[in-house]
Amino acid sequence: MKALLLMSGGLDSSSAAYYYTRRGLDFDCLFINYGQRSARMQLRSSKIICEKLNKKLLVADIRKIRELFISDIWLKPHEPITHRNLVIIPIAIAFAKEKGYEEIIIASVKEDCEYEQNRIEIIKELKNLGEILKVKVSTPFAGMPKSFLLKLGVSAGLDPSLTYSCLLGHKYHCGQCSQCLKRKEAFKSANIQDPTKYLNLS
């Protein structure tokens, strides 16, 4: 059964990619450009990670859809796009079904559940959608802290300096958005040196 790992180039999905490669899982990766500001840098990191792991990276470019569900995101650059998973996960499920994948893996961690689109009830309904289309939707790390998944990735060979987390999409991480703050905390909690270059925006 071949799986499809949703890839963003961040700590979580990159750690998952290394973890599953080490375990010998047969999987490809899917990057979805849904109009996020950081798409270019995310895709860059995703390509690097997949090249190092010799994994196929599929890219779905649906950036035009952002106009349908994003209103003032450009006025709130430090905030993640609300409800994005309600859009991209069903697309990933349909994509997997069409391409013959029987499972999609989402590397969401415990901290992600504070966002509305990652609430347990919503994820459960998305899994039900997958069942209808006979595509298993797996969230194996949902109960784990980000720092634990980072440890798994690094122990499997991940160089975290190759990953990208910032919401702004600059060459260097801003260090202030919610994703940068969670990135910093993950390294601190995991007792792993943070190799990230952060901008000084103060």
UniProtKB/Swiss-Prot annotation:
Binding site for ATP: M7, S8, G9, G10, L11, D12, S13, S14, S15, A16, A17
CDD domains: QueC-like
Pathway of action: Purine metabolism; 7-cyano-7-deazaguanine biosynthesis
Enzyme Commission number, as recorded: 6.3.4.20
A Pfam family: QueC
UniProt keyword ATP-binding present: yes
Residues annotated as binding Zn(2+): C166, C174, C177, C180
Keyword annotations from UniProtKB, A to Z: ATP-binding, Ligase, Metal-binding, Nucleotide-binding, Zinc
UniProt GO molecular function: ATP binding; ligase activity; metal ion binding
Catalytic activity: 7-carboxy-7-deazaguanine + NH4(+) + ATP = 7-cyano-7-deazaguanine + ADP + phosphate + H2O + H(+)
Obligatory cofactor(s): Zn(2+)
Cofactor: binding comment: Binds 1 zinc ion per subunit.
Family indicated by similarity: Belongs to the QueC family.
Its biological purpose: Catalyzes the ATP-dependent conversion of 7-carboxy-7-deazaguanine (CDG) to 7-cyano-7-deazaguanine (preQ(0)).
Xref: PANTHER family: 7-CYANO-7-DEAZAGUANINE SYNTHASE (PTHR42914:SF1)
Identification of the protein by name: 7-cyano-7-deazaguanine synthase 1
